[in-house]
Swiss-Prot record:
One Pfam family in the UniProt entry: Complex1_LYR
Family under the similarity heading: Belongs to the complex I LYR family.
Protein name: Electron transfer flavoprotein regulatory factor 1
Species of the source: Homo sapiens
Signal peptide: none
Keyword field: Mitochondrion
Length: 90
């Protein structure tokens, strides 16, 4: 029972982190929130701790991918702002 509670905490933490990251999702926060909720509800009946750990790892991977997507978008915006003038003069 103790393991289930600790995994539940990890799952909730993952959900909250993904929900926070979804605010800047390119297709909109509402789209992301609906998809996220559906995915978590689809797996709500999983009881096997090993399977739950696999799903948490998969969620953490998605979180890292989202962070990379956002950093890339910011990098491109900054590059366009600061280096667009130098490209026009060449």
């Amino acid at each position: 029972m103790k393991m289930a509670n600790s995994l539940r905490g990890e799952v909730l933490k993952l959900y909250k982190n993904l929900l926070y990251l979804g605010r800047d999702y390119p297709k909109g926060a509402d789209y992301f929130k609906k998809r996220l909720k559906n995915i978590f509800l689809k797996n709500k009946d999983v009881k096997n701790p090993e399977k739950i750990k696999e799903l948490i790892a998969q969620g953490e991977f998605v979180m890292k991918e989202l962070e990379a997507l956002y950093f890339l978008r910011k990098y491109r915006a900054m590059k366009q702002r600061y280096y667009s003038d130098t490209n026009k003069t060449n």
